[in-house]
């Protein structure tokens, strides 16, 4: 640079020119960049010939294209590690201001007569050949930057500098020391592209483009890159595991059941050959613990060592119908002792069974759960035949004994997964059931003779063979609500009928065993007349009939809530339920043993 030119240029232009000269040296001093570097000389060295107005518009078009290309190149050079601050964006606009200030100071000294021609200030810099050379240079630089970015985004392969000796550092951008300079440099960058025209061609709108386009250009570095890599690897591994399990389940479910049946048979033979001490586990293969179902039908003479096996895989919400297990797999295997199992072994084997892995690390599947089996509401369970729902032997353990046994630590798992694992096992159910059967409905109707408003604790005490949860409890409460509704409808009907027959005294009303009202109630609650209706129920029925008769006679039925006082009176007249109804084997004709 000539000394006069250095004197005439303002500080901002000199800074930009200094940066352009440094980048030109990095590009091996190519002729094109050297020629681009001379564009910032004082306009006193410009040729005296002027351009036509068409050439001036052509130069404006070329300058716009150059600005777009340089914006793309500059965006690829910048780092996404931090957003462009307001100070940096302001520095990108400084080169244009420096060039304008340079022209305004240099033109009066060397081109005084041409002050009014703005086209003369920009025209001589950009000849056709020079623009083509600069575009060619920018294309080469863009190609080099693309290769550099591809190398930087390759995972697990540490890229090296062109010399091959130093590893390239993470692409972090930093501003130059001068706040007026708009150039950004990348550490250890082998292909930096910049020139004097590059410093001045970035317009104020380009800074905003750079701010939003630099984020997806380069990959994150340092701890952020490590975190992203770990996330991708973990998600990929989990996806592969889930896909493998689903393929096994959907395409080959029977093979999984056959393998489980073989393993249980092998364990049964080991149990016969190696007797275990009482209270300890006879299994050394941990897979046996995972194949223990929640429903097991005990054989005669086979001891049940621990009642924790009765509820290892209980569903937390609603019951599952026994139809979920195929018919061919409901027969129990003989000589399969059920003994105490350590709690920590339960956790490991439950998780292994859910993941579908055996002890040898091989993946195995479970049969798909039919949509029809997912329905486990009480209407479906009530439609099951008694023979299917009551295929169990009497249990030697009392309910108090069952509740006193410690349970293994709970394993938090999805309800659908638990149901699919348990229903796929080749075992039948034990005495404790999760669904309600027609026998339970019949027993509830008989209990209505003694109590019209039972509590949940009373229901649990008189249904020891049912595994209670919210669905079971609410279903039984709904049963008794329906019983009461039918009962009150009949009482109101016969009270109005007595009033229409001309009866005016409520004391004349009574419910006898040969009356029509008793026949209707006995047919509904004691179908088949298998149970003798207690006398206390006849007294409660007569009292209810009188209460309805008095209310209708007094005209209280015009009030929408006229039945509530009657309900309150009847709710206080519940009597004790006989202890014989607690036995699951009560009434052999209804509850086959």
UniProtKB/Swiss-Prot annotation:
Chain segments carrying region Homeo-Prospero: 433-591
Region feature (Disordered): 24-48, 79-130, 153-199, 260-284, 298-333, 356-388
UniProt source species: Mus musculus
Protein family per UniProt: Belongs to the Prospero homeodomain family.
Record function comment: Transcription regulator. Does not seem to be essential for embryonic development and postnatal survival.
PANTHER family: HOMEOBOX PROTEIN PROSPERO/PROX-1/CEH-26, PROSPERO HOMEOBOX PROTEIN 2
Stretches assigned to the Prospero domain: 492-591
Annotated tissue distribution: Expressed in testis.
UniProt keyword annotations, A-Z: DNA-binding, Homeobox, Nucleus, Transcription, Transcription regulation
Basic and acidic residues biased stretches: 87-99
Alphabetized Pfam families for the sequence: HPD
Entry annotated with the keyword Ribosomal protein: no
SUPFAM superfamilies according to UniProt: Homeodomain-like
Gene Ontology CC: nucleus
Designated name of the protein: Prospero homeobox protein 2
Annotated ranges, domain Prospero-type homeo: 433-491
InterPro entries per UniProt: Homeo_prospero_dom, Homeo_prospero_dom_sf, Homeodomain-like_sf, Prospero_homeodomain
Phenotype caused by lack of the gene: Mice grow normally and body weight was similar to that of wild type. Heterozygous mutant mice survived to adulthood and appeared normal.
Subcellular location: Nucleus
Molecular function, one GO term: DNA binding
Domain notes: The Prospero-type homeodomain and the adjacent Prospero domain act as a single structural unit, the Homeo-Prospero domain.
An example Gene Ontology biological process: cell development
Domain of life: Eukaryota
């Amino acid at each position: 640079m000539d000394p006069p030119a250095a004197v005439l240029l303002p500080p901002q232009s000199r800074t930009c020119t200094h940066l352009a000269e440094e980048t030109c040296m990095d590009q091996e001093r190519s002729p094109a960049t050297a020629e681009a570097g001379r564009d910032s000389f004082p306009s006193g060295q410009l040729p005296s010939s002027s351009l036509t107005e068409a050439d001036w518009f052509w130069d404006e078009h070329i300058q716009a294209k150059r600005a777009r290309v340089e914006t793309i190149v500059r965006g690829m050079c910048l780092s996404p590690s931090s957003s462009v601050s307001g100070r940096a964006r302001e520095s990108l606009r400084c080169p244009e201001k420096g060039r304008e200030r340079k022209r305004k100071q240099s033109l009066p000294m060397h081109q005084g007569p041409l002050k009014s021609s703005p086209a003369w200030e920009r025209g001589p810099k950009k000849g056709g050949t020079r623009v083509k050379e600069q575009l060619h240079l920018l294309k080469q630089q863009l190609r080099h930057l693309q290769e550099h970015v591809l190398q930087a985004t390759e995972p697990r392969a540490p890229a090296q500098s062109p010399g091959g000796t130093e590893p390239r550092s993470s692409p972090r951008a930093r501003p130059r020391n001068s706040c007026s300079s708009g150039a950004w440099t990348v550490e250890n960058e082998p292909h930096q592209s910049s020139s004097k025209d590059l410093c001045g061609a970035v317009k104020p709108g380009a800074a905003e483009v750079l701010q939003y386009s630099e984020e997806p250009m380069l990959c994150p570095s340092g701890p952020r890159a490590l975190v992203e890599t770990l996330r991708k690897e973990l998600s990929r591994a989990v996806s592969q595991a889930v896909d493998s399990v689903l393929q096994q389940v959907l395409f080959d479910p029977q093979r999984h059941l056959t393998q489980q049946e073989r393993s249980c048979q092998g364990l049964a033979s080991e149990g016969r050959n190696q007797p275990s001490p009482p209270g300890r586990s006879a299994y050394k293969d941990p897979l046996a613990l995972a194949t223990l179902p929640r429903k097991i039908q005990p054989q005669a003479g086979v001891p049940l060592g621990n009642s924790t096996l009765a509820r290892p895989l209980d569903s937390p919400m609603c019951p599952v119908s026994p139809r979920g297990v195929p018919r061919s797999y409901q027969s129990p295997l003989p000589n399969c002792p059920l003994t105490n199992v350590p709690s920590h072994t339960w956790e490991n084997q439950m998780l292994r069974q859910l993941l579908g892995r055996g002890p040898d690390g091989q993946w195995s599947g479970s049969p798909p759960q039919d949509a029809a089996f997912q329905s486990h509401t009480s209407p479906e369970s009530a439609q099951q035949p008694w023979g299917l729902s009551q295929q169990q032997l009497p249990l030697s353990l009392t309910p108090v004994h069952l509740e006193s046994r410690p349970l293994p630590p709970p394993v938090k798992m999805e309800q659908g997964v638990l149901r699919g694992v348990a229903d796929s096992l080749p075992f039948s159910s034990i005495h404790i059931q999760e669904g309600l059967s027609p026998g339970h409905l019949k027993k509830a109707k008989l209990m209505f003779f003694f109590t019209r408003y039972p509590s949940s604790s009373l229901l649990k005490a008189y249904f020891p063979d049912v595994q209670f949860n919210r669905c079971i409890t609410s279903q039984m409460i709904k049963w008794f609500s329906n019983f009461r509704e039918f009962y009150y409808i009949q009482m109101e009907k016969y009270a109005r009928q007595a009033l229409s027959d001309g009866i005016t005294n409520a004391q004349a009303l009574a419910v006898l065993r040969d009356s029509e009202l008793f026949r209707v109630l006995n047919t509904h609650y004691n179908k088949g007349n298998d149970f003798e209706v207690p006398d206390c129920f006849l007294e409660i029925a007569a009292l209810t009939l009188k209460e309805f008769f008095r209310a209708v006679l007094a005209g209280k039925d015009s009030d929408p809530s006229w039945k509530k006082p009657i309900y309150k009176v009847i709710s206080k007249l519940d009597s004790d339920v006989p202890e014989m109804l607690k036995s699951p084997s009560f009434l052999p004709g209804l509850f086959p043993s």
